Amino acid sequence: MIESSQPGTLYVGVSTKMYLGYRDSLDWLAAVRFEVDARPALKAGRVVPFVIPSFPMLPAAGKILAGSPLILGAQNCGWADGPWTGEVSPSLLAELGVGLVEIGHAERRRHLGEDAAMIARKVRAADDAGVTPLLCVGEGSAAGAGVSGAETAAAFVHQQIQEAVDGDWNLASRLVIAYEPVWAIGAAEPASATYVSAVVRFLREMLGAHSPVAGSSLGELPVIYGGSAKPGLLPMLEGVSGLFLGRYAHDAANFGKVLDEALALDAILPEDKFHQGESTRGKFVIPG
């Protein structure tokens, strides 16, 4: 489980999906480790890097990343131990040192039949095992330009989150949300910074109606953006908690560039800047 972070913490992460073979994955993990080690400011924990390699890489990845600020993630999990051939339980992932697990990615929803009930079981099982769910959400098609389109998309994403926690907003407070518009995944360019910022702003307003713990608000839940994300995007976003990178970060140097952008944002933004409805450029608080 990822520990509660300081005010203003940013996430920068990447999944390799199934693009890299075993040897290439080892080389890539070593290169990412080099990029992180070259930035000692990451040790402060205000910018949190994470990597999500394919399942067979997890034991080796744990060794390569040992002693670094990098959080190891998994691309999927089952929802129970026992007779589930081919699945990997969250409890086993925890034993391997996995800190977060991707759940509900659009590709699994579309091609592998993952529905809301299955995703909810996985989210609960991961949380019970002490592994932070990285819940992937996003509208299937562009909802339209302007305020109305962004609000429609936010309402859809809010519903996905509610279904994933089965209405348990206390559980929701322990999630990291990856907002990935399905139409932006694998596209030539990410969704526009203006659109993403507007969707996240509306989503925070909707989540803010839920207060699972006295003194906390789900409007402060970490929401990172994914969907053809690449260097140069993060400084343009407002109210977004970081980036979930894909193919652009398979070049470890690009991962380093985004880490630099996050560290620069952290250096110029005051800790008390995170308030619902304000321009925050990635500021967030994980409710304790």
Task: Show where each model-derived region lies.
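Active-site loop-to-helix "anion-binding N-cap" substructures in soluble metabolic enzymes
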Residues: 2-288
